[in-house]
Amino acid sequence: MGSIEPPNASSCLVYQTITEFADFPDHDQKLWWHSTAPMFAEMLKVAGYDIHSRYKALGLYQKFIIPFLGVYPTKTNDRWLSILTRYGTPFELSLNCTHSVVRYTFEPINAATGSLKDPFNTHAIWDALDTLIPLQKGIDLEFFAHLKRDLTVNDQDTAYLLEKKKVGGQIRTQNKLALDLKGGEFVLKAYIYPALKSLATGKPVQELMFDSVHRLSHQYPTLAAPLRKLEEYVHSRGTSSTASPRLISCDLCDPRQSRIKIYLLELNVSLESMEDLWTLGGRRNDTQTLAGLEMIRELWDLINLPTGILSYPEPYLKLGEVPNEQLPLMANYTLHHDDPMPEPQVYFTTFGMNDGRVTDGLATFFRRHGYTHMLQTYRDSLRAYYPHVDHDTVNYLHAYISFSYRKGSPYLSVYLQSFETGDWPISSFGAPILEPVSKKMCRGHPVSFEVPLTKQQVVASE
């Protein structure tokens, strides 16, 4: 009997087929495709998207998103560092495991990003939106335009920050986009980080964010009640609170349906802190909240996050650097038009933890709660995304696990390292060769993460 082939995302037919016919305007775009598309294609398949939706999603990604990812990251090149990942890479895939929804987030980057024309990447997002709006009905920018005007730097702010040399090691990302893939359609979301605006104006991030949403609630009064509740909770934590507002997001749809989400960073990594975030300090105590709380306690035991007071680490990790760090907790609160109470979502920050143990914890959760498909596929899919890493020791694949509880059902998502996937480490992309070995390949860059790589493996891959 022949041996069973181990799972490998580079074998995904949709990825291979698009590769045959795709036109890449430059070398960087080709590298981005072969680094990320195997995992993307495999994730869509595992999540149960039909073949037409998979081709459409990957085709859109190849043609319209990759051009906004900038130069392909290597250990030596000069590139824009994005807050999206600890390695500064501007693209991340995530999977809602309980409802089988794939999403990806990216920070739009263009030729002006980081230059004197746009030193803080304020404007590239508009070019990306101009590209995406014709592709999906119903995109509306009203909430985004309001928040962006209030919370990202304008030309005057930019000149001030440059003149006073205010921005040293400060994280420079100001905005990013996410696409939730629903069948053959997508739902677009935007995220804004006001840290640079705070630096330019001298106003705290918390004040900037809440004031902006307050002004928005004058036009949309249904946002006022949940905003007041959230603001009350944040203020009740006091001036020495370990939790603070960090970013804000909105749906790019009809403002009457668009949700505002306000994110808090919690430096005290403990179950007690997560319980406080989930219940808004005891303000949420309904049956659904308490049912979700029991699952949070279960996940806490299964994932076993190390506890302690943690700051967000600086600077970025170098490509290929194995993390020796842990991130603070995070939570977001959705302001719904029809609910006076903010809806919480909490984040288990698993980056830096052993991915095998994280996977074991998730598998136990899937088994206990009847998510049979995920139980049967999750471990193999992770191995397919990264077939050349040691899954017993690797500790940088799971960045976050998010949890919320709605309408009697858990919503659990994983946010995963999405870089150098599939056969990248042993292909002509990962191995330093001078010329392409086929029309599918191109001159390679050194692989970022160390993997066992023998001459025989390279020859076999050719």
From Swiss-Prot:
Pathway(s) annotated for this protein in UniProt: Alkaloid biosynthesis; ergot alkaloid biosynthesis
Pfam families (UniProt xref): Trp_DMAT (PF11991)
Enzyme Commission (EC) number: 2.5.1.34
Binding site for L-tryptophan: 83-84, 92, 193, 246
Binding site for substrate: 103, 189, 191, 259, 261, 263, 345, 347
InterPro entries the UniProt entry points to: Aro_prenylTrfase, Aro_prenylTrfase_DMATS, DMATS-type_fun
Keyword annotations from UniProtKB, A to Z: Alkaloid metabolism, Transferase
Phenotype of null mutants: Does not affect the production of roquefortine C but impairs the production of isofumigaclavines A and B.
CDD domains in the cross-refs: PT-DMATS_CymD
Free-text function comment from the UniProt entry: Tryptophan dimethylallyltransferase; part of the gene cluster that mediates the biosynthesis of isofumigaclavines, fungal ergot alkaloids. The tryptophan dimethylallyltransferase ifgA catalyzes the first step of ergot alkaloid biosynthesis by condensing dimethylallyl diphosphate (DMAP) and tryptophan to form 4-dimethylallyl-L-tryptophan. The second step is catalyzed by the methyltransferase ifgB that methylates 4-dimethylallyl-L-tryptophan in the presence of S-adenosyl-L-methionine, resulting in the formation of N-methyl-dimethylallyl-L-tryptophan.
Family that this chain belongs to: Belongs to the tryptophan dimethylallyltransferase family.
Quaternary structure (record): Homodimer.
Protein name according to UniProt: Tryptophan dimethylallyltransferase ifgA
